[in-house]
Amino acid sequence: MVKELRERTGLGMMECKKALVEADGDIEKAIDDMRKSGQAKAAKKAGRTAAEGGVVVATNDANTVAVMVEINSETDFVARDDNFLGFCDKVAAAALSAGETDVAKIGELKLEDGSTVEEARQALVQKIGENIQIRRAAKLEAEGAIGAYVHGGRIGVLIALKGGDAELGKDVAMHVAAVNPMVVSGDQVPADVLEKEKEIIRAQPDMEGKPAEIVEKMLGGRINKFLKEVSLLDQPFVKDPNTTVGALVKAAGAEVASFERLVVGEGIEKEEVDFAAEVEAAAKG
């Protein structure tokens, strides 16, 4: 847990240990407390990624509908195996054809050889010798074009555009893969997220002792900055920081309706095996 807190905050081991003790082992509370006290460097937004596998995308011929599926394996070696990759492509194609994103229902879909997705998964498990799981799927439909991008088989993004074309969509999807915005525009940030950010800002050291009107002015400025940082349209475009994503899309006569971003293993905590301890325990009988 100390290691994870260090990775997410960039702080030293002793500082992280102390923060975890004070937060009774609650890592999210520890990060909030460290930010409030002004200790923490910018906390990394991405959750810890532990599980292996791949993200695969399938798009219809008109490029107006796309499905993205995350399928997990136990090791990165298997995630690069041709049998695994072939299975991923078949699952995505079947999900697209049926317009399905429910994992249980995807398992019931028929493949071209007549077997179900679940039967094919079980056969793959027997052949490869690892646990293979279809974890989640996302689907987008666009009035204009769908933008799709998969980075290294591990990060997948779908963009639904109103107007525009696939090339613009791919550019925006690459940006989302790299920068990981929270929402399309600032007005979509959930109220609870906004309130939590306000609470953290109010508790920061430079707010202490200032008149209420000054605090509110500073709060407003910092909240506006936060909203721009997490909103896709307000972010500097990753391929040309001199323009924003919003300006890029507007210049093309398009709008971003929505996006989906999947990262392999996101939110799954992988068990860390201490092989030295295992050997020692085995030696002791």
From Swiss-Prot:
<dbReference type="InterPro" id="IPR036402">
    <property type="entry name" value="EF-Ts_dimer_sf"/>
</dbReference>
<comment type="function">
    <text>Associates with the EF-Tu.GDP complex and induces the exchange of GDP to GTP. It remains bound to the aminoacyl-tRNA.EF-Tu.GTP complex up to the GTP hydrolysis stage on the ribosome.</text>
</comment>
<dbReference type="InterPro" id="IPR001816">
    <property type="entry name" value="Transl_elong_EFTs/EF1B"/>
</dbReference>
<keyword id="KW-0648">Protein biosynthesis</keyword>
<protein>
    <recommendedName>
        <fullName>Elongation factor Ts</fullName>
    </recommendedName>
</protein>
<dbReference type="Pfam" id="PF00889">
    <property type="entry name" value="EF_TS"/>
</dbReference>
<dbReference type="InterPro" id="IPR009060">
    <property type="entry name" value="UBA-like_sf"/>
</dbReference>
<dbReference type="InterPro" id="IPR018101">
    <property type="entry name" value="Transl_elong_Ts_CS"/>
</dbReference>
<keyword id="KW-0251">Elongation factor</keyword>
<keyword id="KW-0963">Cytoplasm</keyword>
<dbReference type="GO" id="GO:0005737">
    <property type="term" value="C:cytoplasm"/>
</dbReference>
<dbReference type="GO" id="GO:0003746">
    <property type="term" value="F:translation elongation factor activity"/>
</dbReference>
<feature type="region of interest" description="Involved in Mg(2+) ion dislocation from EF-Tu">
    <location>
        <begin position="75"/>
        <end position="78"/>
    </location>
</feature>
<comment type="similarity">
    <text>Belongs to the EF-Ts family.</text>
</comment>
<dbReference type="InterPro" id="IPR014039">
    <property type="entry name" value="Transl_elong_EFTs/EF1B_dimer"/>
</dbReference>
